[in-house]
Amino acid sequence: MSRICAICGKGPSFGNNVSHANNKTRTVWYPNLQKIKAVRNGSVKTIKVCTRCIRSGHVTKAL
């Protein structure tokens, strides 16, 4: 799964862009994912994690 956070499972959101003339076009909003090296199950892995999980300390970064 390419655009899903490995920690919280956050993925894309779907909806409409609505113009001033009330025209609607479908759009997708993707989470802000970053590739980081993290300690998972005692080993270092490169995973995609959203910035909210990084900031809130749900991930232990590998040094």
From Swiss-Prot:
One GO CC term, this protein: ribonucleoprotein complex
Domain of life: Bacteria
Keywords: Ribonucleoprotein, Ribosomal protein
Annotated Gene3D superfamilies: 2.20.150.30, Ribosomal protein L28/L24
Keyword Ribonucleoprotein: yes
GO molecular function: structural constituent of ribosome
One of the GO BP terms on file: translation
Record NCBIfam families: L28 (TIGR00009)
Family of the protein in this entry: Belongs to the bacterial ribosomal protein bL28 family.
Database matches in HAMAP family: Ribosomal_bL28
Xref: PANTHER family: 50S RIBOSOMAL PROTEIN L28 (PTHR39080), LARGE RIBOSOMAL SUBUNIT PROTEIN BL28A (PTHR39080:SF1)
Protein name (database record): Large ribosomal subunit protein bL28
Species for this entry: Pelobacter propionicus (strain DSM 2379 / NBRC 103807 / OttBd1)
